[in-house]
Amino acid sequence: MIKEHSFGIIPLRQNQGVWEVFLVQHQKGHWACPKGHPEKNETGLETAKRELFEETGLSVTRLISQIPIVEQYQFTKEGVVVDKTCTYYIAEVSGKEKLQKKEVKNGLWLTLEKAKAVVTFQEGQTVLEKVSKVIDK
């Protein structure tokens, strides 16, 4: 078993008083929030901000919560079990969407409710439910 850790931003904006989240469709077809692996000497938050900008062209305006949401799951890759941890920071973002075509096929702004129906994996739905609880406080 190998362990993997990714960091991402849950990119939010307000549109006419309603929170929306930006989801990306990866080249392999699944929908999720942007995330990636750290580079040398990078903190988790630095990784998350860099990956957000690289994949979407968006930048963090402010963190909505200082407490990240952690998602854990396992999958098999080339016959090896991967124990994956994803740490997400909830943030309000700004900028013009510019997708990194090498990794990202598509991107959409959706209400949190609609996004829960679009994300591919159950873990992603759980993460968005936690986001809803944080922003509804």
Which ranges hold each PLM region?
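Conserved N-terminal beta-strand and adjoining loop/helix that marks the start
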Residues: 1-21
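Residue-level signal for short segments within beta-strands and strand-turn junctions
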Residues: 11-13, 25, 92-93
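Conserved Nudix-box catalytic region and its N-terminal flanking loop in Nudix hydrolases
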Residues: 17-59
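Short aromatic/basic micro-patch
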Residues: 32, 83, 109
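Active-site segment of metal-dependent pyrophosphate-handling enzymes
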Residues: 57-96
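NUDIX/MutT-family hydrolases
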Residues: 90-92, 97-130
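C-terminal alpha-helix
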Residues: 130-137
